[in-house]
């Protein structure tokens, strides 16, 4: 998430096995703008950008993994942009449930509504409508 006018704005969810790289840091060597909040007990492994770049140079398989990771992140960013511009809040909710079937059991509704770009009241209405 990041902050807009002192309010948390969620723009990404991760799950087991996902890699977390602030792309601003990885590619521009600048501090990222995002904050990471773990909602469940987790184990994290840290790898410096310099070490990752060394691994890219040392192993083509790791370099290809990094390229594919970046490609997936670009696609996710584009999908989020398209979703926010052209889909209704109901469609965005349905997409989220399709992508993360157990999200309602794992993430507070306030965070989900932030991700969808709607109020928690609007989210409650959507959920009531499709029950």
Regions found by a protein language model. Give the residues of each.
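Cytochrome P450 core scaffold surrounding the K-helix E-X-X-R motif
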Residues: 1-7
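Generic anion/oxyanion-binding catalytic loop in active/binding sites
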Residues: 3, 41, 82, 101
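Cyclic-nucleotide recognition modules
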Residues: 9-68
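Short, well-structured alpha-helical segments
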Residues: 67, 71, 91-94
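Phosphate-/nucleic-acid-contacting segments
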Residues: 87-131
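Short, Lys/Arg-enriched, Trp-marked, Pro/Gly-tolerant hinge/linker segments that flank
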Residues: 77-88
């Amino acid at each position: 998430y990041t902050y807009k006018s002192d309010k948390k704005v969620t723009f990404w969810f991760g799950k087991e096995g996902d890699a977390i790289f602030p792309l601003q840091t990885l590619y521009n060597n600048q501090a990222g703008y995002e904050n990471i909040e773990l909602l469940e007990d987790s184990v994290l492994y840290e790898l410096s950008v310099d070490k990752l770049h060394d691994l890219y140079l040392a192993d083509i398989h790791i370099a290809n993994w990094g390229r594919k990771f970046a490609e997936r992140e670009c696609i996710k960013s584009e999908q989020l942009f398209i979703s926010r511009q052209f889909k209704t809040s109901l469609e965005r909710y349905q997409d989220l449930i399709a992508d993360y079937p157990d999200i309602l059991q794992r993430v507070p509704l306030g965070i989900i509504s932030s991700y969808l770009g709607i109020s928690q009241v609007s989210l409650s209405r959507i959920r009531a409508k499709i029950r």
